[in-house]
């Protein structure tokens, strides 16, 4: 019962955050997008895909997912095959079988040999696709598991660079006048190390 109520609250938060983004220009849901969940089952700690839910709930709006979790958004990618108003753009270090489809594009930045310049180029590419597609809303999965101290992280991705990534995403959304909602995403460090990284995302959103 507690799990059920928690899941329903999270998903209600996704829908409310989308509405607030259209009203205010920017919003957040203090929860994850659960991007590994597919249509008929949960997957990898993800119950129901809240990113796809937004597209399903608002069929007249084009929902563009900018997924910056270290693991590719494989579940969201699968949803793009039958939800026409959903586009998935995943920038990741670990593939997690994230497929490429007509409306699912991936950018792999190697956790050892990659660098932040490659990463920022991928972010710019994501916004170019959002413009070309005519997105009505960007949902930003602000993953923290790419941090260099995370067990899944990229060795070059420092705390300062994560903050720079967040600032870049918010600045580009504002520049191109995209309503944007963001959700928290992966992070497997100890809580006292992880929470400040998530807090930085909120600071970047208000900078």
Each language-model region and where it sits:
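Conserved alpha-helical scaffold segments that buttress catalytic/binding sites
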Residues: 15, 19, 28-175, 199-203
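Short acidic/histidine-rich active-site segments
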Residues: 179-184
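A short, acidic, flexible beta-alpha connecting loop/helix-capping segment that sits on the rim
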Residues: 146, 186-190
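Active-site acidic/histidine proton-transfer and metal-coordination neighborhood
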Residues: 24
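Active-site neighborhoods of divalent-metal-dependent phosphate/nucleic-acid chemistry enzymes
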Residues: 1-7
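A general structural signal for short secondary-structure boundary/capping elements
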Residues: 112, 185-186
